[in-house]
């Protein structure tokens, strides 16, 4: 992570726990969006046994404001700080991402010790300048799958992937994903992808929302 505050796992945990994904989807977006349970979305991939990836993998998201504050307190203690400020970058021409960003601002600002600075820009500037140059702390982004395989999402977190703008890097994750590419047994490959997502989600390399 380029931001030393976000390099702290407890700070990342606080951010994820502060988001009420169910409330966001049902009462704010109201467009059929579903709360994310992990990095690979529901309805994308079916296992060799005919089961949805999301049903076989664990759920890695939850909303718990008290736990979020506790995680932030611990993170601040580890960092030796009483307060941190994070920039939240979003495109004003990207609906509903602008509404989503405001929701996040309110959620994060409710935590004592965390200040949010909103960085409003355009989609083009967000992708080709801010993200490409690493000029962000938190950024509201999305991904459209290229195919119905979990790797269309999982490869985004590889150390050398050009779309890994946050520069999260985990050697074990990279190793498992390398095995995914070469594994010929469909069931074994499926389990490797579940294992890889577990590493990514537990370390909060990305924070899936909806």
Residue ranges and their predicted role:
Residues 18-23, 28-32, 44, 72-79, ...:
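Sec/Tat-exported extracytoplasmic proteins
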Residues 35-75, 94-98:
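Structural transition elements
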Residues 10-13, 25-26, 59-61, 115-127, ...:
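Extracytoplasmic/peripheral linker and loop segments enriched in polar/acidic and small residues
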Residues 1-37, 83-95, 184-204:
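Alpha-helical secondary-structure segments
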Residues 8, 79-81, 131-134, 148, ...:
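Extracellular/periplasmic catalytic domains that process cell-envelope and extracellular macromolecules
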Residues 73-145:
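Ligand/substrate-recognition segments at binding pockets and active sites
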Residues 26-30, 38-39, 100-101, 150-153:
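Short, solvent-exposed loop/turn and secondary-structure capping segments
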